[in-house]
Swiss-Prot record:
Chain sites annotated for binding a divalent metal cation 6: C36, C40, C43, C59
The keyword Metal-binding appears for this protein: yes
Record-listed a divalent metal cation 4 binding positions: C32, C33, C43, C47
GO biological process, one term: positive regulation of cell migration involved in sprouting angiogenesis
Binding-site residues, a divalent metal cation 3: C14, C18, C23, C28
Known role: Metallothioneins have a high content of cysteine residues that bind various heavy metals.
Protein name: Metallothionein A
Residues annotated for a divalent metal cation 2 binding in this entry: C6, C12, C14, C25
Binding positions (a divalent metal cation 7): C49, C54, C58, C59
Keyword Metal-binding listed: yes
Amino acid sequence: MDPCECSKTGTCNCGGSCTCTNCSCTSCKKSCCSCCPAGCSKCASGCVCKGKTCDTSCCQ
């Protein structure tokens, strides 16, 4: 089960090592998603990006 899927509660419990497969949860976008620009194979669905590099520092 994806700890970051929050379709039932609207929130999720994410640890520092959390790996999201479903990034629709707002509270997970900062702490869990590998945020990459379009075209990056590591980009998690639904991530909000502020940079163009393929690393975790590009997450807002």
